[in-house]
Amino acid sequence: MFSLLSRALCAASSSPAAPRGRSLLAALLSPSASPLDPCRGPAAPEPPRRRAFHGSPSPLGFRSTPASWSSPEAGAAVGGDDGLEVARLGISPWIVERLAARGITRLFPIQRAVLDPAMQGKDMIGRARTGTGKTLAFGIPIMDRILRHNEKNGSGRNPLAIILAPTRELARQVEKEFKESAPLDSLCVYGGVPISHQMRALNYGVDVVVGTPGRIIDLLRRGVLNLSEIQFVVLDEADQMLAVGFDEDVEVIMENLPQNRQSMLFSATMPSWIRKITSKYLKDPIIIDLVGDEDQKLPEGISLYSIASEHYGKPSILGPLIKEHANGGKCIVFTQTKREADRLAYAMGRSYACQALHGDISQNQRERTLSGFRDGRFNILVATDVAARGLDIPNVDLVIHYELPNTSELFVHRSGRTARAGKKGSAILIYTNDQARAVRIIEQDIGCKFTELPKIEVADEASDMFNVVRDNRSRLAGSPRTGGSSFGRGGYGGFGEGRSRGFGDFDGFGSSPNRGGRSRDAGSRYGSGFGDFRRPSNAFGRSSSKQPDGFGFGDFGEGNFSRNGNRRSRSFDDSGSTRYSRRPNGFGTSDFGRSGGFDDSN
């Protein structure tokens, strides 16, 4: 039956006296018809999918929010707090509905302070403590204006708003906020992932672009990002963009933007470069300063503690601190280096569910790690300062500064991962005796006061976070098949003489000589880090190098846990020498008695 109909339609279409037959044929043979239809032949390739163009890039209209809506009395009407009801802002019902679905019905101080000038289209500079919800502060006005513009003119191909962020984590967080708060097409662009996917999304058309300056410059040079219709530009964490070297890229991007736009800049500090770009690219900006001359820049609900510890004893006091102050909730431990984060996460993983986060981890793995931490699949995140800014992880109960931050501002941003959005939290600073002066400087710079915690004795086995090995892998690795005591019973090798400190307590991460079996102390009274192995173990591959490979933090492949030429493995010591200092130093020592190899960047 189908073949007879097909032949009849083909004959009708070929007859010059049958225009109605051609019309019928055209209607039946739609683009969705089978490419094997005998009347059509092979299907033509589909053109690139693009959104409908709006008529012209006309400026977005603005309206003023009634001042009464942002008055203290309005917030006091419901709940008696300083909030502002989202439903009373007069913004798009789409935004109100989506924010309500996320549990956001009221705004915080910086949001209500920014709202009125943003709705009027004025340039502004926003300064506030970390964790106060800056993303919604500039996001609500932008989303509302673009939604109303698209309802009137249709969606265009080129973006109408661009937000610059210093890190990929912050960029992803901002773009996620837009995506969850309004039915707009948004795109996050950053390095470390294939650029082709981002180019395809731009060809399709987007409303909002969020990204790091470096990748945005790359897209501009390739000609796939058109900024000619931009009417909103936001610089988020502008001071951090200066710190990571994006200052020139930011100025190049600002030079390529239309003159008729609204510019908003948000920063915790105001260095000279910030003042330069505000005077050059912002028009009579309004300053929204919720910090002012106050020294305290930390969230209101944060409790600050400090605790003194010897360097080799730091790992052992983490367990008691987490148990007492995190109360089973989320905890972020900040380290100075990527290697240190890897080591600490690996060690803590024997007794706790934890993972590491730093710049050398692939983007896909970073996303999985952050997702798992947010969802509660593990509660301890060991991170470098890559996580100090921009990551909006809810319900972090405790922040531990395993090493002192380089600056007071970095301490603020690290600690600001807890006590966010009006909640309570704690931050603990671990310091050595020779760092006591640096702690006082932080107190003076920030205007805070630490509560000193009593010192925890490292030798207290009940307090050692590593004295219980819950992982079956440790018992398997401690069997003769995998090299004896290199992993076995007590952990990373036995420490023969004296009492092992740090990770090397007899019942902690180091086993006694009689129970360890295959490894001996390298000669120091205290175990250096995870243990020094005089007798080599070749369980995990061999290395032809005469330099000891230690753990290497690869995938336990060739070279890790290896036999080396001088029959001595320095475990986690990263210095260039095979000699050992007698000074205890946590994860390994160099000739100078200091931690070796911890000088990599974040």
Swiss-Prot record:
SUPFAM superfamilies: P-loop containing nucleoside triphosphate hydrolases. InterPro entries: DEAD/DEAH_box_helicase_dom, DEAD_box_RNA_helicase, Helicase_ATP-bd, Helicase_C-like, P-loop_NTPase, RNA_helicase_DEAD_Q_motif. Its EC number is 3.6.4.13. Residues 115-288 form the Helicase ATP-binding domain. ATP binds at A128, R129, T130, G131, T132, G133, K134, T135. Residues 317-462 form the Helicase C-terminal domain. The keyword Hydrolase applies. Residues 33-43 have a biased composition (Low complexity). It catalyses: ATP + H2O = ADP + phosphate + H(+). Keywords: ATP-binding, Helicase, Hydrolase, Nucleotide-binding, RNA-binding. It holds the Pfam family Helicase_C. GO terms for molecular function: ATP binding; ATP hydrolysis activity; RNA binding; RNA helicase activity. GO terms for biological process: Group II intron splicing. Residues 33-76, 503-602 are annotated as: Disordered. One of its GO terms (cellular component) is cytoplasm. It comes from the Eukaryota. A motif (DEAD box) lies at residues 236-239. A motif (Q motif) lies at residues 84-112. Belongs to the DEAD box helicase family. DDX21/DDX50 subfamily. The Q motif is unique to and characteristic of the DEAD box family of RNA helicases and controls ATP binding and hydrolysis. This is DEAD-box ATP-dependent RNA helicase 53. It comes from Oryza sativa subsp. japonica.
